[in-house]
Amino acid sequence: MAGTFTLRVVSPEGNVLKEEAEFVVLPGGNGEIGILPNHAPLISSIEIGVIRYTVNGKVEKIATSGGFVEVSDNKVTILADTAEPGERVDLDRALAAKERAEKRLTQREGIDVRRAELALMRAVARINAARN
């Protein structure tokens, strides 16, 4: 696993990350997408989940609510709907959001079920990004 590639994560709020990474794993629609240096060109959507990447042998995490990834010329650019590095996640707030979404899903009456499911998925992604 010699070498690195440039990893950029951009969200509507601005640049979230620019690092020389050794490996990145993205939440894809049909499972995880793993990218190493010199990966073949690729454009794909990503789903709600956790982006895991390795820099200098250390694994870091970013919670995302989806977006797109482009791989080209040893550069990986992630255009994320939202992107929150794990160390910035307010874990108590994420746990409370998870609890609210679970409560809504048990009631089911008078709620938008899909919206509650997505809120639960986002909360779980934030929790997973914050935890080691």
Swiss-Prot record:
PANTHER family, A to Z: ATP SYNTHASE DELTA/EPSILON CHAIN, ATP SYNTHASE EPSILON CHAIN, CHLOROPLASTIC
Pfam families named in the record: ATP-synt_DE, ATP-synt_DE_N
HAMAP family membership: ATP_synth_epsil_bac
Organism: Desulfitobacterium hafniense (strain DSM 10664 / DCB-2)
Entry similarity comment: Belongs to the ATPase epsilon chain family.
Subunit structure, as described in the record: F-type ATPases have 2 components, CF(1) - the catalytic core - and CF(0) - the membrane proton channel. CF(1) has five subunits: alpha(3), beta(3), gamma(1), delta(1), epsilon(1). CF(0) has three main subunits: a, b and c.
Location of this chain's protein in the cell: Cell membrane
GO molecular function terms listed in the Swiss-Prot or TrEMBL record: ATP binding; proton-transporting ATP synthase activity, rotational mechanism
Membrane topology: Peripheral membrane protein
Protein name: ATP synthase epsilon chain
Function of the protein: Produces ATP from ADP in the presence of a proton gradient across the membrane.
GO cellular component: plasma membrane; proton-transporting ATP synthase complex
UniProtKB keywords: ATP synthesis, Cell membrane, CF(1), Hydrogen ion transport, Ion transport, Membrane, Transport
Main location: membrane
Superkingdom of the source species: Bacteria
InterPro entries found in the cross-reference section: ATP_F1_dsu/esu_C_sf (IPR036794), ATP_synth_F1_dsu/esu (IPR001469), ATP_synth_F1_dsu/esu_N (IPR020546), ATP_synth_F1_esu_C (IPR020547), ATPsynth_dsu/esu_N (IPR036771)
